[in-house]
A protein has these predicted regions:
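N-terminal beta-alpha supersecondary unit
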Residues: 1-66
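Generic hydrophobic alpha-helical segments
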Residues: 39, 43-46, 50, 99-100, ...
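Stable alpha-helical structural segments in soluble proteins, enriched in small hydrophobic residues
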Residues: 46-50, 85, 103, 191-202
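DPxDG-like acidic metal-binding loop motif
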Residues: 61-95
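Acyltransferase
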Residues: 182-237
C-alpha cells in the first residue's frame, strides 16, 4: 500500500509519499502564499524521486486540523481534488493526534497544542494505552494559555506539553509546577507520525470519501471573523 501524506495545518507544510514498511520520501517547507501551487509541484517531485506513479497511490492521508484555517483549506482541498481524480479514498487525521503520537511512550498525561493565533491554542489531552499507542481522553477545544494552564494545574499530576502552542506560551505554562515540555523538534506535526497513524487506519478501511472530508477548526475562521469586524466598522461609520 502506498499513501500520499499532506499536512498544511501549521506554519510548516509537509508532504510525503510512503509505501508501507519502507522509509518515506519527505519534503517540508514554510507555508508560502502560493501554497496550492507549491503542493502540486512537490507532489510531482516526490513521485519522480520515488519512481512511483500516481496510479500506484492507494490513498491520501491528510491532516484535517485543528490549525491555521487558510492552510488547512488548501491542503484538504488539494487532497480531495487529487483523491477524486484518482478515485482513491482519504484517511483524515487530527493535527493534535499526530503531535501526541510522537509522545506515545510517555507515562505522563500528554497535552498536545497547536497555536490558534489570537492569543489562543487548540489542545487535547492524551494517555498512553497498552500496545504502544496513545488515546485522546478529552475533547479538542480552544482556549487561552492561562485557561489551559489552570486546567492542567487542576489535574494535580505531571503533564507533558507538546507542540508549537506550548513553546509559544512557555512563560505561561511554566508557572505550573507539574508541567514538562517536549523538545522543539516536535513543535509541528511530523509526517512519519502521520503515516504511522494512517496506515493502520487504511488497513482497517477507516476511509472517508473525498466529498465527505472537511477541516476540524473548532472556532470561526479568522477570515470570517475579520469580515464580521469590517462589516461592524462600516455600520459604526
Amino acid at each position: 500500500m502506498i499513501l500520499l501524506g499532506i499536512d498544511t495545518a501549521t506554519e510548516m507544510t509537509s508532504l510525503g509519499l510512503c509505501r508501507y514498511g519502507e522509509p518515506p520520501f519527505l519534503v517540508s517547507f514554510p507555508g508560502p502564499k502560493n501554497q496550492l501551487e507549491s503542493i502540486g509541484e512537490v507532489v510531482q517531485r516526490l513521485l519522480e524521486n520515488s519512481e512511483y506513479h500516481r496510479s500506484q497511490i492507494n490513498g491520501v492521508a491528510v491532516d484535517v486540523g485543528p490549525g491555521l484555517f487558510t492552510g488547512l483549506r488548501v491542503g484538504v482541498s488539494f487532497a480531495k481534488s487529487l483523491a477524486g481524480a484518482l478515485g482513491i479514498p482519504i484517511v483524515p487525521v487530527s493535527s493534535l493526534d499526530i503531535l501526541a503520537f510522537s509522545q506515545r511512550n510517555c507515562p505522563k498525561t500528554v497535552v498536545a497544542t497547536v497555536d490558534a493565533r489570537r492569543g489562543e491554542v487548540f489542545y487535547a489531552m492524551y494517555r498512553k494505552v497498552p500496545g504502544g499507542g496513545i488515546a485522546r481522553i478529552s475533547d479538542i477545544v480552544v482556549g487561552s494559555p492561562e485557561d489551559v494552564a489552570a486546567e492542567i494545574e487542576s489535574l494535580a499530576e505531571s503533564v507533558l506539553l507538546v507542540g508549537h502552542g506550548a513553546h509559544k506560551y512557555k512563560e505561561v505554562f511554566s508557572t505550573v509546577s507539574q508541567v514538562h515540555f517536549a523538545g522543539s523538534a516536535v513543535s509541528y506535526p511530523l509526517m512519519p507520525m502521520l503515516f504511522e497513524i494512517a496506515f493502520p487506519m487504511a488497513f482497517s478501511e477507516e476511509f472517508v470519501p473525498p466529498e465527505s472530508v472537511d477541516v476540524v477548526y473548532i472556532r470561526d475562521a479568522d477570515a470570517r471573523v475579520n469580515f464580521d469586524v469590517r462589516q461592524a466598522l462600516r455600520k459604526d461609520g
